[in-house]
A protein has these predicted regions:
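Active-site and donor-binding regions of nucleotide-sugar-utilizing enzymes
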Residues: 5-32, 36-132
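Active-site-proximal region of nucleotide-activated glycan assembly enzymes
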Residues: 116-164
Length: 164
C-alpha cells in the first residue's frame, strides 16, 4: 500500500507561481497542491491550471494579514484541510517585504513553513529557529544596554566624591 500524496498549501500566487509549482512537484512527486490567493490573482491561477477545487480565494483584505485570514472562510478551509506542508512564495530571494504572508502561514502552520524563492529554491523555516534567533537578539540588546549603562554611570558614580 502506497503512502497518500503530500498535501501542500501554497500561499501567495504571483509571477513565479509556475516555478514554485514545479519546485514543489520535483521535491514531492505526486503532491496535491492547494493555492491561497487573493481574487486579483485568479487569472494567474487559471493560467497555471489550478482548478477551483485547489484554490482558496481570500477576499477579506487586499493583502494577507494573520488575524483577518484566520477569521475568514479561506482561513477556516485552510485549517480544516490538515495540510502536510505550508509553503510561501517569495518574490524576493531573502523574503524582504513578505512578513505578513509569513505570519499568516505561521497561523496555519505554527511549527514553520517552507519558503519558495523565484528561482525555485526551497527554504525551510522552523518556528523554534525563529524564536531562538529573536531571543538571542533580545538578550544581546539587554546586554549591550547594561554595558552602556555601566560605561556611562559607573564613572559618574566613581567621580562623585571629587566633585565640588
Amino acid at each position: 500500500m502506497s503512502a497518500p500524496p503530500e498535501r501542500i498549501l501554497l500561499f501567495r500566487s504571483g509571477r513565479h507561481l509556475a516555478t514554485a509549482l514545479a519546485a514543489l512537484r520535483a521535491a514531492s512527486p505526486g503532491c496535491d497542491i492547494t493555492v491561497v490567493a487573493t481574487p486579483a490573482a485568479a487569472p494567474a491561477l487559471e493560467q497555471n491550471g489550478i482548478d477551483a477545487g485547489h484554490r482558496l480565494l481570500y477576499d477579506r483584505t487586499p493583502f494577507f494579514q494573520p488575524w483577518p485570514f484566520l477569521t475568514s472562510a479561506a482561513g477556516a478551509r485552510a485549517w480544516a484541510g490538515r495540510f502536510d506542508r505550508v509553503c510561501v512564495l517569495w518574490n524576493d530571494p531573502d523574503g524582504a517585504g513578505q512578513v505578513n504572508v509569513d505570519h499568516t502561514a505561521l497561523v496555519v502552520s505554527p511549527l514553520g513553513f517552507t519558503a519558495i524563492t523565484a528561482d525555485g529554491s526551497l527554504i525551510v523555516h522552523r518556528t523554534t529557529t525563529i524564536v531562538r534567533r529573536e531571543a538571542a537578539r533580545a538578550v544581546s540588546s539587554i546586554g549591550i544596554a547594561m554595558l552602556i549603562g555601566l560605561c556611562l554611570f559607573l564613572p559618574a558614580r566613581l567621580l562623585r566624591p571629587f566633585r565640588s
